[in-house]
Amino acid sequence: MASISSLHRWASNQHSRLPRITSISEADQSRPINQVVAFSVPISRRDASIILLSSIPLTSFFVLTPSSSEARERRSRKVIPLEEYSTGPEGLKFYDIEEGKGPVATEGSTAQVHFDCRYRSITAISTRESKLLAGNRSIAQPYEFKVGSTPGKERKREFVDNPNGLFSAQAAPKPPPAMYFITEGMKVGGKRTVIVPPEAGYGQKGMNEIPPGATFELNIELLRVTPPPEEK
């Protein structure tokens, strides 16, 4: 059996290891109950590091950034000063984002393009969202027309057979009249943005999200050019 002196030494050692709490005098008891009580607890350097890291918000380590595709799109889009635009037929203002390196679209040639009509931040009309005849899914269907021709003549064809299925030309996105002549001079692979006033666009009727009498932005990408028969 342990001696009384041994038990006394053990109790003294355990007491020395306990946290030391500062006493609160009777005068201090009148202070608000939510006052901070100081602890004097010996801790190691490793424990101090863990406590410090746990007190830092996670947002200090993880910064939410936009997806890479959104970042690329934001970098690629810029505000082009109006003075940098060129003036084309009918006084239309256009700017070539990419010049292209292929054949040139001339009057009478058949052009195949992708086009997007943007009103403010909305893409109102786009060949990249054309519909199949069944209307059950969207496909990217380039638009084909004759440069310099009367707008809409090619839309009178009933059907166009393409690798993606039977496609209704009459259900295709309706391009603005400006596209039929502003495409002239573009090279295959080129991308052009055009400021389209209502008289060269959708007039006083509007189209989809483009309101009546609105000016909008037309983006054209020239995919292919077939020269007129006499030039072959």
From Swiss-Prot:
InterPro entries: FKBP18-like (IPR044180), PPIase_dom_sf (IPR046357), PPIase_FKBP_dom (IPR001179). Its EC number is 5.2.1.8. The keyword Thylakoid applies. The keyword Translocase does not apply. Residues 108-226 form the PPIase FKBP-type domain. It catalyses: [protein]-peptidylproline (omega=180) = [protein]-peptidylproline (omega=0). Pfam families: FKBP_C. It comes from the Eukaryota. It is found in: Plastid, Chloroplast thylakoid lumen. GO terms for cellular component: chloroplast; chloroplast thylakoid lumen; nucleus; thylakoid lumen. SUPFAM superfamilies: FKBP-like. Signal peptide: none annotated. Keywords: Chloroplast, Isomerase, Plastid, Rotamase, Thylakoid, Transit peptide. GO terms for molecular function: peptidyl-prolyl cis-trans isomerase activity. PANTHER family: PEPTIDYL-PROLYL CIS-TRANS ISOMERASE FKBP18, CHLOROPLASTIC. Belongs to the FKBP-type PPIase family. PPIases accelerate the folding of proteins. It catalyzes the cis-trans isomerization of proline imidic peptide bonds in oligopeptides. This is Peptidyl-prolyl cis-trans isomerase FKBP18, chloroplastic.
